[in-house]
Amino acid sequence: MAKYVIGSAWPYVQTVPHLGNMIGSVLSADVYARYLRLRGHDVVFVSGSDMHGTPIEVEAIQLGVDPAEYAFKMHGVVAELFKRWNISFDLYTHTHSETHVAFVQEFFKRIYENGYIFTKDEEMPYCPRDKIFLPDRFIIGKCPYCGYERARGDQCENCGRLLDPKQLVEPRCAVCGSKPEWRLTRHWYLDLRRLEDKIRKYVEENPHLPQNAKEMSLAMLKEGLKPRAVTRDNKWGIPAPFPGAEGKTIYVWFEAVLGYISAVVEHFKRLGKESEWEKYWRDPDTKIIFFVGKDNIPFHVIILPALLLANGGGYTLPTTTASTEYLLYEGDKFSKSRRWGIWIDEALHLLPADYWRFILVYIRPENRDTSFTWAQALEIVNKVLNDDVGNYVNRVLSFIKSRMGGVVPPPGTPQEEDKSFLQAALQLFKKAERHYEAVELKDALHTVVEIAREGNRYLNARAPWDLLKTRPEEANAVMYHAYWSLKMLAAGLAPVIPESVEKMWEMMGRPASLTWDEALREPAPGVKLGEVKPLFRKVGEDEVKKMLQALEQMKREKASKKYPWEQALL
């Protein structure tokens, strides 16, 4: 049994996440954490709401509310939605917790004492109208690299490059649109230059990093790492702990990534095992894996390891950052302003959570940008989830229920065809295992579905309904092996569609606790089945048209409400 810390990128609670955010981090992390638990590993799965920083402060100013009120209300909304999506966090917290604030301040004090922090006076954009400095998202302009018109002062969300406000072309205040002035202010910087060789070694020698994470990180290293300001002039954040830094806060990205540690601290504190966290974050054998979209790669592959090294506290460096490409919606980027896409609160009013989980993992953008389309979603639900998976489960269990007394038959007299089918199912199951281990979640799901397809072909070829009349022992063998394959199917699908598999396992008579190893064990004859009902249903084209109409209505209703927490559909 290995120890794992699994972290999904902390959602910024300025708004509700959309489907792309979901598959890029939270859902992917949940699938992997559930798989690891099925394998019997010791897993701590954490995340939390990213509460601080300029976007929330800007939005709060524009709405006339306190940033803390805004952040806490949105945290409650997002936490509730993740529950409804069946996300199995061990702890979902937030960056304004006492534990996180104290941890971040002590962590940066140590970096300062180690000599990796220096001060520099420099000109920063200042809005004379609003009388505030304009860090990060307080300032927008054209990206100097890709030309994106609404790049932020810290990063371009279009090309992912880290930016400095002075690099923006035609900058303007995000609050009022005014042209900024440049005024002198003092900031505290992390000297990334002194850590560059160690970071390069970490990236180059890491065999687990996905291609996009490695390529983006090596490109940044090739350009040379530059010192990055760890303080900001905005008010809503964690007060900087450095001497003379009164009135400054820690830059949101530098403190949010430390949440992966502070959340584990908080988790064990809640369990009354306060020092237990060190067995995870200070044990070199612990596997630490983050799930993020590609725009978050620099902060997880460069910045966080740099912070851990600069702190010198014996922290284990992350094993990998499982980064996805972007999910598009009908060929275009999600856009709240253009009402383009589906947000996770809207989705649950259209289809059950397991349907969405299955669709998103089935099309997970692992190697290239992928587009969600309703046509493809319809095909996945109707042909894959219902016809391939649901139909096979129903065929096997309904036959045993109606023709074999509702109990798992004895192994009977297996023929070569039965042995061949079992071997094929086992090989697919082990192949799915390899994909899960490599965090290739889409390929893992596609492989698990093949077990059901193989099973449907097997039943058609062996025709147990005919064998039952003349060779009942062979019919027993067929249905025994088919039932065994359902155990593999259940284990393989459980990380993706947990609620449906729970129902499936109940129908199968709960032969044992569902684990990965249990799927490989021969079934015990005589297990009594539960009530057998179809697991899934088809979705018609007319129903999709109604869904799209309902989606538009939801978006109109949202737009009519002032506050984001009122807009969320709970």
Curated annotation (Swiss-Prot):
Instruction: Give one Pfam family.
Output: tRNA-synt_1g
Phylogenetic placement of the source organism: Archaea, Thermoproteota, Thermoprotei, Thermoproteales, Thermoproteaceae
Chain location of the short sequence motif 'KMSKS' region per the record: 333-337
Q: How is the cofactor bound?
A: Binds 1 zinc ion per subunit.
Q: What class of enzyme is it?
A: ligase
Name the UniProt record assigns to this protein? Methionine--tRNA ligase
UniProt source species: Pyrobaculum calidifontis (strain DSM 21063 / JCM 11548 / VA1)
UniProt KW Nucleotide-binding keyword: yes
**Entries under InterPro entries matching the protein:** Anticodon_Met, Met-tRNA_ligase_1, Met-tRNA_synth, Methionyl/Leucyl_tRNA_Synth, MetRS_core, MetRS_Zn, Rossmann-like_a/b/a_fold, tRNAsynth_Ia_anticodon-bd
One Gene Ontology term from the biological process aspect of the record: methionyl-tRNA aminoacylation
Q: Which cofactor names does the annotation list?
A: Zn(2+)
Give the Gene3D superfamilies listed for this entry. HUPs, Isoleucyl-tRNA Synthetase, Domain 1, Methionyl-tRNA synthetase, Zn-domain
